[in-house]
Amino acid sequence: MVPVVALVGRPNVGKSTLFNRLTRTRDALVADFPGLTRDRKYGRAEVEGREFICIDTGGIDGTEDGVETRMAEQSLLAIEEADVVLFMVDARAGLMPADEAIAKHLRSREKPTFLVANKTDGLDPDQAVVDFYSLGLGEIYPIAASHGRGVLSLLEHVLLPWMDDVAPQEEVDEDAEYWAQFEAEQNGEEAPEDDFDPQSLPIKLAIVGRPNVGKSTLTNRILGEERVVVYDMPGTTRDSIYIPMERDEREYVLIDTAGVRKRGKITDAVEKFSVIKTLQAIEDANVVLLVIDAREGISDQDLSLLGFILNSGRSLVIVVNKWDGLSQEVKEQVKETLDFRLGFIDFARVHFISALHGSGVGNLFESVREAYDSSTRRVSTAMLTRIMTMAVEDHQPPLVRGRRVKLKYAHAGGYNPPIVVIHGNQVKDLPDSYKRYLMNYFRKSLEVMGTPIRIQFKEGENPYANKRNTLTPTQMRKRKRLMKHIKKSK
């Protein structure tokens, strides 16, 4: 499970600065839902291979209304959602009554809490944090969020319990590996395969969307049709529910972010949107069903969720619910709007359904299987290199400083999502337009549907880089003769 880190503290202690520094590693603000999240912002970040979700909360400015009340509005919710809390204080301003009130509340919660003293740049950290030891939260971590000083050390301590989940990276001679695979494939031999068989694993399917778009209705419709649910496996109170099921002799794990409930027990309170549940479900899924309300159309919240799905590299099927009862004219308008606003994700299948009446629900699983198979398909190095060569022949890379960018070979760099690694010279100077061209060319050539393709570029190393030129004895004698000739001519 992806860990969740919440930033809490008074206003202007640097929470947003730290949030921006952390999420900038992925260059994405995941979601900002006014009115739903109480000014909380959610971001996705990565440190040394460990991904986590970061929550930036609004500041708590005083105790006049009671810390409990102010916390309940935004920060308390963030604390409850989080696995770890970073309590930030201002080292320049010193200890404030609001800091003491927040610390008192945090001590009453059974959450790992790290006391972070920000704005220590230009100060003696040891002296600046002395007063904050009275808060009773243990070790203090001095940082300067604006400059990044101390942030990495802090995160190493914060994420330590989850670092065991990160697989160590092995050093691989990719050039040697490529030529070995290429030679084997040219000789008609099968390239060595790893032990991973995607068809032997159940497909993890997450159903996500805004409140009241019909997620629970769709979940109950799917489960009601199949009637093969063995048992529910709830995690903690904030975890999604994982439901094993089977359809057409294929195993699935349905990740329900709202919980499976009887129709009579579904209330507005129970249907409340949980951002964290949704983000974690997306991270844990193989395929995501994004449910959209046909009557309301595409909203900014839908696009925020869509952005997170794409950034996560998950396979995607778009489900337009509540299609029944709409006039033909309205249906055409909805389709035109979808084509306009979702034109940039032409790789995803779009289904128009009625979860309430069941129309179109059965067709979803064909697209789910297609998307999963596309995302886990193994493609040989030789095939990827041939596709790259054809793409270059059809459209040459641009000139960079008078020299044409040279693409050498391509190989698979990962799956779910599919990653194609292209090696070449000056690839860092390729314009984004050509990178998009290559991505679309690979997608069409491989007939990938339902999943994004990622292209990574690696610069070929110059074997003479950082090496001093050494003249041969013949070259040295020639150099001496030339130098004598130059001196005589003077």
From Swiss-Prot:
Tell me where in this chain the KH-like domain is found. 377-461
Sorted alphabetically, which PROSITE patterns does this protein's record hold? Answer: G_ENGA
Which residues are noted in the entry as GTP 1-binding? 9-16, 56-60, 118-121
Record-listed GTP 2 binding positions: 209-216, 256-260, 321-324
Any one Gene Ontology BP term: ribosome biogenesis
Q: Domain EngA-type G, which positions?
A: 3-166, 203-376
InterPro entries for the chain: G_ENGA, GTP-bd, GTPase_Der, KH_dom-like, KH_dom-like_a/b, P-loop_NTPase, Small_GTP-bd
Annotated TM spans: none
Q: Example GO molecular function term?
A: GTP binding
Matching Gene3D superfamilies, A to Z?
3.30.300.20, P-loop containing nucleotide triphosphate hydrolases
Which is one Pfam family of this protein?
Answer: KH_dom-like
Keywords, alphabetical: GTP-binding, Nucleotide-binding, Repeat, Ribosome biogenesis
Task: State the disulfide connectivity.
Answer: none
Q: Which domain of life is it from?
A: Bacteria
Query: Which PANTHER family does the record cross-reference, listed alphabetically?
Result: GTPASE DER (PTHR43834:SF6)
Q: Explain the purpose of this protein.
A: GTPase that plays an essential role in the late steps of ribosome biogenesis.
Q: Which family does it belong to?
A: Belongs to the TRAFAC class TrmE-Era-EngA-EngB-Septin-like GTPase superfamily. EngA (Der) GTPase family.
Its quaternary structure?
Associates with the 50S ribosomal subunit.
Question: What protein am I looking at?
Answer: GTPase Der
What is the gene name? der
